[in-house]
């Protein structure tokens, strides 16, 4: 064993050994030495986008996974930890435009570098199962399942309103529309209706909701609530406001009924206006002869269309000059166009009840509309001058100003009004969902081609199964002016599978969330070109532990659950939910430093470029540039980001201090599910600990060799040896518990205490001490191994443990020696008249009378009683003795 710890040599040696013997190659139905089958455990991190380099968030995520995999393997599990690449998507297209290389080359170059980084981290990944979303062998099955969904009616085609950039000739996501303009071209964005494919996730809404509420106990509560809210089940009434408004052809628009959905049918007698979305047919009709309305509608189209954007936007509207009829009274109700009404939600229309809806109240106050109270609460006075929370309460109020419905509770009024609407043919109770069908069509190049052929005679025709995959050309270079597939004749030109005539391929590609909705199952069935998954999937799935960021709580996790249920219904799976347990690791944070530029922008600085300014309490209050001493702004801590120059390059840290240092720091600095604040001093502390571990092993190598060979029996060990063993096994017991709770920071803390205990133990020389050191260091190495596998593997091998117990990768997890935890003596706090005055040591099984005698005989008792005899002695077993006098 070398005297000095050199992480580059230690880590290279360990990794070479692991690679040479395929240490992480996993097979189904692995056996124990006695022939019994090992229990399986599937632990998986959310697959990364190959952006170019790993960041510290990756390091944290994968180290959590790796610790779990290694410790469970020691406990006898057959553990699967795979890895793949979420390789399709816009960043590759944007990089291709900038660098003028095909997205495929950019993507595969990045994968090669990031894979090298992962191996440098020492991750226990079975690379034989690697998948890549842009590999035709993978996305073939996206296309295959899409066709199956099309057959079952789960996939269907309809028109959709999109953000269209007329300069770049492409569709933009809502997030790419900034102040009504394209994020790249700066051109005013247009709203266009184009056809696209959708998946009926709404058919699974009830099952998705029920299981996230009642069937996923291993998921964080906040994620379950987020999914519940996203699905957004609402029970209410869908009712119609009749009208006689006709289009230019004399046809009643939408057959003369304006439908709305409400969860507050009890307030229908308080309706004073209705509002429709800017895209609603009634709005379009009214705008033809109303220039102000037409202008307003165009302005609405420039904004984003997400619910989040609409929720924060100032609520504005304009009257159409049209009216509809109240379904129960027949009175005219003015019709408005509102910028807060979504065409994609419900029927694209809402009823306005200003008295009992805060948004409607503000809208009515702004435009001087009537506010009619129809719900009252005993002892409270209503005023239409300012909103009060009780106006919207539906638990305790009673109806007023509602004719025959007066005096009813909310539930009673809803039932009565729904019954009357139903009798009139103008409404019924209905359950709706916030969840919308999943639109998967993207007018992008770098994605899975949708396997559809367009024929002038036959229309859209599915690609025959035997012709899959429809292969994406991987040599195209986007130029920013639309989808390059639409200009590539070699891809476009084909024959219609139905009639054989010349036809054109679909140029839309699939949403990249399709790729990530089932990749974790492909890991279980690698190399199968005949089926999406096979019987090996039944062995590994459902996944035991999924690990990833909270930002994926809704879309990815919801789509993966939906995809699983579709595969189940197609007879491919035997389970309902893909992920038994979910851990959402916290973000990695670092300090942010910036200043305003003369042009009004913000310039960010790397932490190493500045010196902090501290207040009297040691808190950072500002910073100075090291280069010229000028003061800059300290912005606190925030998520590591390239744009804010506060990221830390894992590769630089690995190259200088080693992967084990990086792993140890990110595991020790914070519990896995909480945010982690970066600390250079914390990194240095982690490295010092590893050097101290190495030094201890080197210094005690001879004692370990003697101890391993001694076969010492512990019953006759001297007291200091027994004390050390008791402390170490107590720490082992705590560490084992913390491993099971995934509280890895306290596992590291226990390891540090174990090191201190061994290093500071005052043991008499001899066989007992040697055996205790050998045993203790062996315990420490096994507890630490999942955290820092390289250095522990090296020490384990060099000190001879491997020869005795086998390679550390498969060394058994140590059992707690319960006998070692039993103390011969215990320490009791000594009190005199209730005040702590010292401590005494007594035999663990000492009788109460013996404890009293030892306590009374102490010098401190005589001194504090000032010669008075004790009146009584109180013994609290195992804790204290109190002499009263």
Swiss-Prot record:
Gene of this entry: leuS
Enzyme Commission (EC) number: 6.1.1.4
Protein name as it appears in the record: Leucine--tRNA ligase
Catalytic activity: tRNA(Leu) + L-leucine + ATP = L-leucyl-tRNA(Leu) + AMP + diphosphate
UniProt entry keywords in alphabetical sequence: Aminoacyl-tRNA synthetase, ATP-binding, Cytoplasm, Ligase, Nucleotide-binding, Protein biosynthesis
Organism: Bordetella avium (strain 197N)
Parts forming coiled coils: none
GO-annotated molecular function: aminoacyl-tRNA deacylase activity; ATP binding; leucine-tRNA ligase activity
GO annotation, biological process: leucyl-tRNA aminoacylation
């Amino acid at each position: 064993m070398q005297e000095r710890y050199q992480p580059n040599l230690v880590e290279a040696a360990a990794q070479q050994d692991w690679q040479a013997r395929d240490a992480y190659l996993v097979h189904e139905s692995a056996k124990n030495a006695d022939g019994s089958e090992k229990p399986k455990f599937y632990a998986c991190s959310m697959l990364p986008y190959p952006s170019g380099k790993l960041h510290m968030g990756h390091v944290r995520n994968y180290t959590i996974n790796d610790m779990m995999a290694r410790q469970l393997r020691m406990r006898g599990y057959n553990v699967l930890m795979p890895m793949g690449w979420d390789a399709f998507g816009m960043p590759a297209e944007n990089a291709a435009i900038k660098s003028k290389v095909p997205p495929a080359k950019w993507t595969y170059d990045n994968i090669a570098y990031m894979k090298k980084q992962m191996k440098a981290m020492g991750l226990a990944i079975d690379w034989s199962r690697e998948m890549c979303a842009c590999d035709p062998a993978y996305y073939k099955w996206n296309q295959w399942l899409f066709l199956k969904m099309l057959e079952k009616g789960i996939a269907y085609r309809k028109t959709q309103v999109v953000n269209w950039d007329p300069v770049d000739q492409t569709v933009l996501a809502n997030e790419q529309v900034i102040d009504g303009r394209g994020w790249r071209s700066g051109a005013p964005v247009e709203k266009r209706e184009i056809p696209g494919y959708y998946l009926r996730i709404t058919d699974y809404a009830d099952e998705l909701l029920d299981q996230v509420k009642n069937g996923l106990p291993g998921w964080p509560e906040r994620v379950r609530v987020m999914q519940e809210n996203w699905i957004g089940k609402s029970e209410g009434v869908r009712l119609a406001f009749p009208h006689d408004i006709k289009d230019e052809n004399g046809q009643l628009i939408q057959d003369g009924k304006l439908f709305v959905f409400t969860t507050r049918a009890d307030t229908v007698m308080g309706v004073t206006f209705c509002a429709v979305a800017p895209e609603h047919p009634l709005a379009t009709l009214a705008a033809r002869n109303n220039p102000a309305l037409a202008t307003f509608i165009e302005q609405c189209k420039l904004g984003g269309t997400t619910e989040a954007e609409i929720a924060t936007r100032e609520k504005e509207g304009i009257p159409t000059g049209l009216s509809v009829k109240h379904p129960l009274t027949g009175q005219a109700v003015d019709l408005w166009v509102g910028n807060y009404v979504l065409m994609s939600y419900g029927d694209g229309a809402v009823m306005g009840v200003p008295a009992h809806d805060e948004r409607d109240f503000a809208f009515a106050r702004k435009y001087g509309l009537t506010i009619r109270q129809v719900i009252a609460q005993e002892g409270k006075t209503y005023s239409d001058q300012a909103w009060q929370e009780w106006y919207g309460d539906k638990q305790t109020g009673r109806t007023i100003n509602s004719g025959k419905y007066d005096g009813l509770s909310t539930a009673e009024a809803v039932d009565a009004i729904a019954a009357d609407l139903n009798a009139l043919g103008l409404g019924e109770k209905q359950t709706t969902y916030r969840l919308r069908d999943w639109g998967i069509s993207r007018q992008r190049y770098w994605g899975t081609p949708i396997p559809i052929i367009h024929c002038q005679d036959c229309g859209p025709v599915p690609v025959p199964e035997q012709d899959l995959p429809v292969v994406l050309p991987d040599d195209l270079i986007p130029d920013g002016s639309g989808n390059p597939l639409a200009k590539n004749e070699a891809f476009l030109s084909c024959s219609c599978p139905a009639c054989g005539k010349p036809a054109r391929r679909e140029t839309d590609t699939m949403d990249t969330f399709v790729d990530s909705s089932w990749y974790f199952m492909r890991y279980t069935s690698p190399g199968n070109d005949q089926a999406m998954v096979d019987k090996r999937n039944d062995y590994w799935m459902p996944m035991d532990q999924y690990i990833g960021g909270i930002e994926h709580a809704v879309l990815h996790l919801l789509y993966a659950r939906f995809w699983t249920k579709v595969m189940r219904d197609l007879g491919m799976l035997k389970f309902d939910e893909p992920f038994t347990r979910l851990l959402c690791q916290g973000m990695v944070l670092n300090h942010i430093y910036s200043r305003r530029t003369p042009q009004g922008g913000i310039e960010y600085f790397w932490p190493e470029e500045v010196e902090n300014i501290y207040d009297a309490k040691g808190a950072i209050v500002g910073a100075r540039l090291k280069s010229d001493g000028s003061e800059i702004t300290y912005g606190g801590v925030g998520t590591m980001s390239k744009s804010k120059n506060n990221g830390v390059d894992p590769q630089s840290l690995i190259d200088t201090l080693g992967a084990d240092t990086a792993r140890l720091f990110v595991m020790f600095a914070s519990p896995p599910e909480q945010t982690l604040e970066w600390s250079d001093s914390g990194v240095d502390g982690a490295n010092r600990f590893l050097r101290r571990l190495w030094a201890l092993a080197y210094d005690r190598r001879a004692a370990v060799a003697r101890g391993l060979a001694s076969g010492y029996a512990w019953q006759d060990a001297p007291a200091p040896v027994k004390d050390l063993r008791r402390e170490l096994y107590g720490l082992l017991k705590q560490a084992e518990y913390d491993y099971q709770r995934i509280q890895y920071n306290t596992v590291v803390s226990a390891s540090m205490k174990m090191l201190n205990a061994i290093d500071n133990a005052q043991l008499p020389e001899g066989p007992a001490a040697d055996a205790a050191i050998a045993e203790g260091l062996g315990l420490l190495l096994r507890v630490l191994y999942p955290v820092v596998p390289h250095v522990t593997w090296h020490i384990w091998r060099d000190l001879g443990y491997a020869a005795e117990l086998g390679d550390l990768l498969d060394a058994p997890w140590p059992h707690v020696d319960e006998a070692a935890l039993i103390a011969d003596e215990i320490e009791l706090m000594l009190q005199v008249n209730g005040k702590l005055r010292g401590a005494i040591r007594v035999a663990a099984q000492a009788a109460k009378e013996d404890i009293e005698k030892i306590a009374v005989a102490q010098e401190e008792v005589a001194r504090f009683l000032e010669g008075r005899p004790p009146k009584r002695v109180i013994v609290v077993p195992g804790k204290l003795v109190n002499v009263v006098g």
